[in-house]
């Protein structure tokens, strides 16, 4: 499936009744849904280029939700994750959010609140993908200059490190800021820092 098909909400839970219930709720709200019985099945079907979010049970047989979160991070995938948790798993879910998960919901959850969370997660995923597309437009030299600017280097230091003139550094810096749509070094630094894992608003 391509981005032209719209974002996809993945539901990963070993409880078939809950999976079916979530699929019905999400499809009723107009979302496209892919439901999987476990983490392994999700990994076999997940397409990183497809926009979306992941509704994930924290405790499952085989690979747990937390282990799947770690595996996705290891593979460099930044899909927003909303963990589904029982009351006793709240400390575990809080830890998952600290490690980059978007949010967690406790069972039994409010359907309307869950739909709002999913809409927020999809909006953040779309924005992250837009930012990533802007970064893709940078040349390799512009990326080098950008990384050194973000590291706090001055133009003359960047010029010396890359064996180019200060004027060339300034031209690359101007190109970076134009392509990324920022108008200050502070905004550039913030944009680069925000390119990590999606977090809740």
Predicted regions and their residues:
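C-terminal output helix
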Residues: 89-91, 105-118, 161
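Active-site beta3 strand of CheY-like receiver
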Residues: 49-55
